[in-house]
């Protein structure tokens, strides 16, 4: 037990020193890169055979390509061998002079990370380009907007077509592929859509407007009034001087009726009452038995 403990204490671990590297190089020059376990048995180094081999392969070989990037041929070789052997980095490194298994492993891991980053960026770009929110912001652009015309039959507004504008983009649940710049048409339900905000007085206004227009047309056609036309008709009578009277008369030619005014009311008949008759006239207006029910005034 004590011997085994002593041997374990003799095995050295940790970083290598320059003196140990020099002993290992001299051993390889003399015996070649083999018999790694004999180095410790001969008492040359207190290192295990595995530690001596890895130190030589990864750090002390003369043809190592330390700090050099993989060439295009080396990258192609690693990709082909990895698809054939899998993650056998030490075996793949034997096909690449000057490359260690750690070099191959580091190259492969960095390549995988780079590819994953590229794929992630491309997926983000594709998802943002096909995002429905970004595509919905360009829908519903009304270009051919037709105004609402006024009906000639009345004062109501008749809605013929409903157009799509940018202000109702949030209210119309259609995509840009379905709507676009086209005009939405209402289905024919047999009902005429009319809006008459002043329908309570349209009939009266229209009637007055038509009557006044007809009167204006008649006045434009016949410039003389009915009374003037009657007077002109009487001029053909040979006794029209008797009708008109002398020219120097101050009285009017003829008295025309006033059709636009009501006839004057009948004048009231009033008689003059003297001062002496005022009291009697005032009392005569009361009935005769008015004072029968009045109590006499008591004497003082």
Curated annotation (Swiss-Prot):
Keywords associated with the record: Activator, Cell cycle, Developmental protein, DNA-binding, Nucleus, Repeat, Transcription, Transcription regulation
Free-text disruption phenotype from the record: Loss of male fertility. Reduced expression of germline-specific genes (e.g. MGH3, GEX2 and GCS1). Blocked generative cell division resulting in the formation of bicellular pollen grains at anthesis. Pollen fails to enter mitosis at G2-M transition associated with reduced levels of CYCB1-1. Blocked generative cell division followed by endocycle during pollen maturation leads to single larger diploid sperm cell unable to perform fertilization. Enhanced polytubey (e.g. multiple pollen tubes entering ovules).
Chain intervals with Basic residues compositional bias: 136-145
Chain spans, region Disordered: 123-145
Annotated ranges, domain HTH myb-type: 8-64, 65-116
Induction profile: Repressed by the microRNA 159 (miR159); the production of miR159 is stimulated by the anaphase promoting complex/cyclosome (APC/C). Activated by ARID1 in male germline cells via specific histone acetylation regulation (e.g. H3K9Ac).
PANTHER family named in the record: TRANSCRIPTION FACTOR DUO1
GO BP, one annotated term: generative cell mitosis
Spans through the membrane: none
DNA-binding keyword on record: yes
Subcellular location, record wording: Nucleus
Leader peptide range in chain numbering: none
Function comment: Transcription activator that acts as a positive regulator of male germline development by promoting both gametic cell specification and cell cycle progression. Binds to canonical MYB sites 5'-AACCGTC-3', 5'-AAACCGC-3' and 5'-AACCGT-3' in promoters to trigger the expression of male germline-specific or enriched genes (e.g. MGH3, GEX2 and GCS1), including those required for fertilization. Required for sperm cell specification leading to pollen maturation by activating a germline-specific regulon.
Matches recorded under PROSITE patterns: HTH_MYB
Highest taxon listed in the record's lineage: Eukaryota
Pfam families (UniProt xref): Myb_DNA-binding (PF00249)
Classification of source organism: Eukaryota, Viridiplantae, Streptophyta, Embryophyta, Tracheophyta
UniProt GO cellular component terms: generative cell nucleus; nucleus
UniProt feature, compositional bias: Low complexity: 123-135
SUPFAM superfamilies noted in UniProt: Homeodomain-like
Tissue spec. comment: Confined to inflorescences, especially in stamens and pollen.
UniProt keyword Transferase present: no
Coarse class of the protein's main subcellular location: nucleus
DNA-binding feature ranges: 36-60, 89-112
Molecular-function GO terms, alphabetical: DNA-binding transcription factor activity; sequence-specific DNA binding
Name by which UniProt lists this protein: Transcription factor DUO1
